[in-house]
Structure formats: structure tokens, C-alpha cells
């Protein structure tokens, strides 16, 4: 079986060379402009279900912006853990959730497509900045049934955001391992639940 290059394969090769060139260039402050951060988060009770609301700060470098505009997908994971706080024993996990959002540029429509991977809902946005603004707001995400929490116990919730590049082609994934711009992860943002 012979390899016959196709347009996607050639484009992936071009992106690999472009990203490799960016990785081989001397490190600059631009590559690590800011870090991911969870600015605020809370769980709001509505209809017997707790919903997550969070505000994220997601600065990305010019290299990542270029990659997105050339068709490299970006997957953001928002992880949530809810634990029962215990005195003498380790905390026990009550719930955990990983919400994934895919952001990809569609060259045909010249728009950025933001897709909620868990629900399948998607939005079409005109610019990368509009897409990142939308991505930085987690609103009314159902995460936990009220019946799982007892009012006489103490609970803590923790949220973090990170880039998952497991969905990109293998050649790019191997290269991204060495490029700092694609390794972004916030610290855990933790708060005590008010029941």
C-alpha cells in the first residue's frame, strides 16, 4: 500500500512544519502570555439540580491563534469535583464531571464553531475573540442532583480548566508535546458549598 498525499495530509504536514518552526524559535514572553485562571465559580440550585456558573480567563498566544485559524482544533476541558469534607478521614468524592468544548475554524464559512462535546450543541461565531469570550463563560451547566447532598454535612467544590489536545492529528499531537503554548491548565478553584 502506497501513501498518496491528500489535501488534509498536506495541510497537516504544513502545520507541523509551521508549529515546529515556532517551537524551534527562541522562547519569548509572547508564548506564555498569562495563564489559565478560574476567576469565579458557584453552584446554583434550580429545579432540584445544582448548576455550575464559572468565569474563566483563557489567554492564548499568537501561535495558538494561528493554529486555530489554520484548522487545528482546540478542546477545552472544564473539570468539576464535589467532595464531602470529613474530619478524620480523607474527603469522599460525591460527584465529578468533565465538560468538553471544541473550538475549530471553518474555512468555508469563515467562522469559528464552538461545540459542546457533551450535549452536541454548537454555536457559530464571527471571530476568535468572540469564540474565546463565549468559551470563558460557563453558564447554568447542570452538574449535581440536590438529593446527593445532605444539609448537615460540609461540601467543597473545585473547578479547573485546561487544554486537551488529544483530538488533534497524531503528528501535531507529538509536536504539541514540546510546545508550551498548547500546555495550559488553571489551578483548582475551590469553595465551600452553601446548602
Label each PLM-derived region with a short phrase:
Residues 31-43:
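N-terminal edge beta-strand
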Residues 66-129:
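Structured domain cores in non-transmembrane regions
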Residues 25-29:
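Sec/Tat signal peptide C-region and signal peptidase I cleavage site
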Residues 143-195:
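Glycine-rich, aromatic-bearing surface loops/beta-hairpins
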Residues 52-56, 107, 117-123, 127-149:
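A beta-strand/beta-hairpin structural motif
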Amino acid at each position: 500500500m502506497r501513501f498518496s498525499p491528500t489535501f488534509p495530509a498536506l495541510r497537516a504536514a504544513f502545520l507541523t512544519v509551521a508549529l515546529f518552526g515556532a517551537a524551534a524559535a527562541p522562547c519569548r514572553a509572547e508564548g506564555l502570555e498569562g495563564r489559565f485562571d478560574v476567576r469565579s465559580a458557584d453552584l446554583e440550585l434550580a429545579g432540584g439540580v445544582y448548576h455550575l456558573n464559572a468565569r474563566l480567563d483563557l489567554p492564548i498566544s499568537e501561535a495558538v491563534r494561528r493554529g486555530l485559524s489554520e484548522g487545528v482544533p482546540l478542546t477545552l476541558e472544564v473539570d468539576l469535583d464535589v467532595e464531602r469534607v470529613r474530619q478524620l478521614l480523607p474527603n469522599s468524592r460525591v460527584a465529578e464531571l468533565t465538560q468538553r468544548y471544541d473550538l475549530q475554524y471553518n474555512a468555508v464559512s469563515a467562522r469559528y464553531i464552538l461545540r459542546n462535546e457533551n450535549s452536541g450543541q454548537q454555536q457559530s461565531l464571527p471571530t476568535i475573540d468572540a469564540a474565546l469570550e463565549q468559551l470563558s463563560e460557563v453558564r447554568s451547566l447542570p452538574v449535581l442532583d440536590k438529593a446527593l447532598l445532605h444539609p448537615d454535612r460540609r461540601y467543597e467544590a473545585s473547578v479547573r480548566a485546561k487544554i486537551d489536545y488529544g483530538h488533534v492529528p497524531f503528528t501535531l499531537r507529538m509536536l504539541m508535546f514540546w510546545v508550551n503554548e498548547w500546555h495550559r491548565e488553571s489551578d483548582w478553584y475551590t469553595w465551600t458549598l452553601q446548602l
